[in-house]
Regions:
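Two-component/phosphorelay signaling modules centered on CheY-like receiver
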Residues: 12-30
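Acidic catalytic/metal-coordinating carboxylates
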Residues: 33-34, 60-64
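Active-site beta3 strand of CheY-like receiver
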Residues: 45-52
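Receiver (REC) domain active-site loop signature in two-component systems and cognate sites
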Residues: 56
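Alpha4 helix (beta4-alpha4-beta5 surface) of REC/receiver domains from two-component response regulators
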Residues: 63, 84-99
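C-terminal output helix
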Residues: 105-115
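The C-terminal output helix
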Residues: 115-131
Length: 131
């Protein structure tokens, strides 16, 4: 079964194009229009990687990541944003994000970031299995 990638973005066009791109690369993908929708979904703890919009109405991508971490759910995260903010980028990468991409991004940016995220998640899972 392919790894599940969850895309959480309030922009319909970004969700649609990301879903198509990720699916064409052979991954399972689910899209959500808000952090709150993702939190209520049956896919909450099934995603192997999250692609999160930084700025969304309601809970932002970084807020969602912090909430998940506070609940013990560590999942690799790729942030996407329309606003280039080097300070926010540095902060999120320092805090463990796999990538921080500025829209519009393309497959040469997103797909390698997803591969890195899934590999980092796989290494973490193996470490937890040995405990």
């Amino acid at each position: 079964m392919p790894s599940l990638v969850a895309v959480i973005d309030d922009d319909h066009a970004v969700r649609e194009s990301s879903e198509s791109l990720i699916r064409s690369a052979g991954f399972a993908v689910r899209v959500f229009d808000s952090a709150e929708q993702f939190l209520k979904s049956p896919y909450l703890r099934k995603a192997a990687c999250l692609v999160l919009d930084v700025r969304m109405p309601g809970m932002s991508g970084p807020e969602l990541r912090r909430k998940l971490l506070s609940e013990g759910y560590e999942v690799p995260v790729i942030f996407i944003t329309a606003a280039a903010d080097e300070e926010a980028k540095a902060r999120e990468l320092t805090n463990g994000a796999v990538a921080y991409l500025t829209k519009p991004f393309d497959e040469k940016e997103l797909l390698p970031a997803i591969d890195r995220a899934l590999k980092s998640g796989s290494r973490r899972d193996h470490r937890e299995d040995r405990r």
